[in-house]
Amino acid sequence: MAQKQTPSGPTQRQQRVAELIRHALAEVLQRGDIQDPVLGSHVVTVPEVRMSPDLKLATAYVMPLGGQDEAPVIAALERHKKILRQEVARRVNLKFAPDLRFRRDETFDEAARIDQLLRSEKVQRDLESAPREDDEGEPASSSRD
């Protein structure tokens, strides 16, 4: 029986397989199994992998440590996609080895942007002028100990 994709996100199986593939990719990249000057000169992190519902496509979000030279690193990973797929298949027991797709991880940029917004003067003013509430939803007393 086919498993339905819920609109709320990936299934538990997709998440479990994605995590196994993330660990396998990270291990291959950390050990230096791929002989490439670009990959050899960068430490590449794999913070997230997302699986398609049929588990035949894995999208790996990658970022070189320090955030520099993402384009050459992703190009090198794409060049060695076949070898990486074989290594992942060897480490993860699946019926089919998923095709790998590499994308730039933008979560660090997004986190920095949100941090910058939270530190802006306008937000600081709004936070200072907003009435505080205690756990019960009642305005907190203004006395401080």
UniProtKB/Swiss-Prot annotation:
Keywords: Cytoplasm, Ribosome biogenesis. Residues 122-132 have a biased composition (Basic and acidic residues). PROSITE patterns: RBFA. One of its GO terms (molecular function) is ribosomal small subunit binding. InterPro entries: KH_dom-like_a/b, RbfA, RbfA_dom_sf, Ribosome-bd_factorA_CS. It is found in: Cytoplasm. It comes from the Bacteria. Gene3D superfamilies: 3.30.300.20. Residues 122-145 are annotated as: Disordered. SUPFAM superfamilies: Ribosome-binding factor A, RbfA. The keyword Lipoprotein does not apply. One of its GO terms (cellular component) is cytosol. One of its GO terms (biological process) is maturation of SSU-rRNA. One of several proteins that assist in the late maturation steps of the functional core of the 30S ribosomal subunit. Associates with free 30S ribosomal subunits (but not with 30S subunits that are part of 70S ribosomes or polysomes). Required for efficient processing of 16S rRNA. May interact with the 5'-terminal helix region of 16S rRNA. Belongs to the RbfA family. NCBIfam families: PRK00521.2-5 (NF001802), rbfA (TIGR00082). Monomer. Binds 30S ribosomal subunits, but not 50S ribosomal subunits or 70S ribosomes. HAMAP family: RbfA. PANTHER family: RIBOSOME-BINDING FACTOR A, CHLOROPLASTIC-RELATED. This is Ribosome-binding factor A. It comes from Methylorubrum extorquens (strain CM4 / NCIMB 13688) (Methylobacterium extorquens).
